[in-house]
Amino acid sequence: MLVPPEMIAVQSKLIYQMNKYCADRVQARKAQIHKTIQEVCRVVQDVLKEVEVQEPRFISSLNDYNGRFDGLEVVSPTEFEIIIYLNQMGVLNFVDDGTLPGCAVLKLSDGRKRSMSLWVEFITASGYLSARKIRSRFQTLVAQACDKCAYRDSVKMIADTTEVKLRIRERIIVQITPAFKCAGLWPRSASHWPLPQIPWPHPNIVSEVKTEGFDMLSKECIALQGKNSAMEGDAWVLSFTEAENKLLQGGCRRRCLSILKTLRDRHLDLPGNPVTSYIMKTLLLYECEKHPREMEWDENCMGDRINGIFLQLISCLQCRRCPHYFLPNMDLFKGKSPGALENASKQVWRLTRIMLTNSRCLEEL
């Protein structure tokens, strides 16, 4: 079937607009973030070097691979999370029975092996390795390191939280999170994935993702707040960052994510932070399921994919629920106020209407 010339012209204009937006706005955002990352990592590496001197079990895994840092996540242009991978999970079993949405526990495989664990003093009487106890010890060490390190005049611990958070030069926030890497494992709470009726991702990619596994993070879990407090302290938060990044390879998926993050930072950085970059990434993964064929991720389709994601976002905000991609029982809007979600819904709808009705909208956005 021949495509009318006017449709080709509209499509060409949109591709030009998208490419120009990437060259201008997206690249400017990336350049600024790259510069900030260099500064952040210099400070954090120095702090972690001091921590390691005091406690050799906390070895920094923040290494520079040609400008990329393993375990560093950009939350926003001024907020970052750095994962510190801990050693030796050996004598502990991973237990995911579904009672803690988005979380799991690490339990001694045999009570007699308690003394064999590298983390023996953080194991509870019931045999669980307590995420909160490890984080509390790490927090104390980081606070001491901040006072001793070379950047002590520009880095401060953020108080009133059980998280390990630093403020650098008053404007940048960095959370440092202890974690275990769980390679070759796949949690029961994500066992439904991939959905059998959807031909995406390719079985080879699924196999790679499941072999690579996931991470268990020592951080507060909003889903558990107000529940059994003892279990809440012992539980580890499941994270699938590597899996998500692998799934978004190919076609224009990564470019879509960069555009979505840029639009989010410029227009949806709202009170209460209802729309995070992670929510954009999650909705992009759902869009990949809705459009499983590679031809649907050609640059000609990029405008349609981005509009589809914004329409999904409006629907989620109106329903006040955004399920985690791998753990659908976990709601990413948990803890957000209805007012913040309502306000975000109106703002996203305004933005989406502009994008659907004005082919040159990216010049102003």
UniProtKB/Swiss-Prot annotation:
It is found in: Nucleus. GO terms for cellular component: nucleus. Signal peptide: none annotated. Transmembrane segments: none annotated. InterPro entries: Mab-21-like_nuc_Trfase, Mab-21_HhH/H2TH-like, MAB21L/cGLR. Keywords: Nucleus. Belongs to the mab-21 family. This is Protein mab-21. It comes from Aedes aegypti (Yellowfever mosquito).
